[in-house]
Amino acid sequence: YYQAKLILFTEQMAKQAIVNIDDPYGARLAKEAQIPVKTYSEKTLADYTASQIESDVHGVSYILKTEDVSFPVHVAIPGAFTVYNSLSAVGACTAMGIPVETAAQALSKLHGVHGRCESLDTQGRPFGIILDYAHTPDALVNILSTVRQFTKNRLIAVFGCGGDRDPIKRPIMGQMAAENAD
């Protein structure tokens, strides 16, 4: 699998790569790619590093650090994955010649896709609601783990397995919900 992905990081396929070095395969890829690589991380020094990360039901905030500058970033999409996705986006933008400042500021205007880790308006009630179209056991575990990070009390999950789509996953999804929600 890794060798198949490595083909994407050759001169025939790309001019530059933006790689998450917090991922073991990404760290390996950063060393083995045949093209210039820019790295991103929230755990170690990289070309694009996130620090002072704060996350809640309304999104994530962090300090974006490059070799030259630091910027506060806020993205109105909750979840740890948002930090990685936004770092990757900044890297892609700068690879296309967009200044890092412009890319970082644009993230604050970003809103997620409806139904993907979407924070719903609870009109001031003392709870949050996250809507997500998690339709695999892994996706359900990921969203519940994400929401658990900023849940102060109980985490209640309501999910469904629509239609006749892959009925084998249903008991697994139920088990994942039972193990990862209250």
Language model region names:
Residues 113, 138-141, 145-182:
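Active-site beta-alpha connecting loops in nucleotide-dependent enzymes
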Residues 43, 134, 160-162:
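Histidine- and/or cysteine-centered catalytic micro-motif in compact active-site loops
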Residues 128-135:
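Switch II (G3) loop of P-loop NTPases
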Residues 2-128, 152:
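Acidic, Mg2+-coordinating active-site environments of NTP-dependent enzymes
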Residues 88, 135, 139:
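Conserved cofactor-binding/catalytic machinery of classical short-chain dehydrogenase/reductase
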Residues 117, 132, 157:
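Hydrophobic, well-ordered secondary-structure elements that form the walls
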Residues 19, 131, 159:
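Active-site flanking residues adjacent to catalytic metal/cofactor-binding acidic residues
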